[in-house]
Design a protein with these regions (language model features):
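Active-site loops and adjacent core secondary-structure elements that bind or stabilize anionic groups
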Residues: 1-177, 202-204, 212, 252-264, ...
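C-terminal amphipathic alpha-helical interaction region
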Residues: 178, 184-185, 189, 194-281
Length: 281
């Protein structure tokens, strides 16, 4: 496990105040939006037919729906993130109070994990692969010393859901489909933006541009994981993020079945390890 660059500028929770409305559109993955969200796969089409569809259907639709979203004031982004001292032991990952954070190597807690874990404020228990290389997410965090884990929660806002209900109830299913797809991708764009901010904060954006306007959605240092996926399948662990980041202050809530509302919202944990990657268990 490699050590994260120091110093970390703060520990605990922070709300990203930067106006990211227009910025978010530049972070949208349009291939996913058009093919997966809107269902335009282009299968069986020639290169010329695909380009014609892009020029005459998809891009005009995108610009029109974007204009409607802005005109109606639907997009109200919230970006919350935080840094918490962390340790791992086997499959478990322990989070500690921000007061145990450090600003120099001399301040890093190095007492044994057996002693330190008694002070943990939250614990994750991740599954481990039963085949080589036997990975678990906990492997990407130091065991013999305190490390840092980043948490994120972002939302495109509750007005999307209300407007989508209006469209659906009116039988305007095509427009509902377009608005819903773009709203979901705006939430994903916000997740990418806050992840980029984390890489900038931690000094691990060395191979990409050094501002939020420098879009980099692949081949970056570290990895972002959302609960419910194979490496961290326990949806109930989302409550840890809610307990620490307190997104309820911004109208973001967790249901009894651990679904996030509004729907155009997402949470994640961020590993800064350079070898962190997506994997199945």
């Amino acid at each position: 496990v490699q050590t994260c660059a120091l110093p970390i500028s703060f520990w605990g929770r922070r709300v990203l105040k930067t106006d990211v409305k227009e910025l978010a559109y530049s972070w949208i993955n349009h291939k996913i939006l058009f093919a997966q969200r809107w269902g335009y796969s282009g299968k069986g089409q020639s290169k010329e037919e695909k380009q014609k569809q892009l020029d005459e259907v998809l891009w005009p639709t995108y610009e029109r729906v974007k204009a409607d979203i802005e005109r109606l004031g639907l997009f109200e982004p919230t970006l919350i993130y935080g840094y918490y001292p962390a340790r791992s032991h086997e499959n478990e990952l322990y989070l500690f109070d921000e007061k145990e954070g450090y600003f120099s190597e001399e301040q890093v807690c190095r007492e044994s994990v057996e002693v330190a874990k008694a002070r943990a404020i939250k614990v994750f228990d991740f599954p481990r692969q039963n085949r080589a290389p036997y990975r678990s997410l906990s492997d990407f965090i130091h065991s013999e010393r305190h490390d840092v884990l980043a948490l994120t929660c972002v939302s495109a806002g509750a007005k999307f859901s209300a407007y989508e209900k209006e469209l659906y109830d009116a039988g305007n299913f095509t427009e509902y489909f377009f608005v819903h797809g773009l709203g979901v991708e705006l939430a994903e764009a916000l997740a990418e933006i806050v992840h980029k901010q984390i890489r900038l904060d931690l000094g691990i954006a060395e191979h990409e541009g050094h501002s939020l306007r420098d879009v980099q959605m692949k081949r970056y240092h570290g990895c972002r994981y959302s609960f419910g996926y194979p490496a961290c399948p326990a949806l109930e662990d989302t409550k840890v993020i809610f307990d620490l980041l307190k997104p309820e202050e911004f109208g973001i809530h967790l249901s009894e079945t651990f679904q996030i509302h509004p729907e155009q919202s997402t949470t994640a944990i961020v590993m800064h390890h350079k070898e962190a990657l997506y994997f199945n268990v």
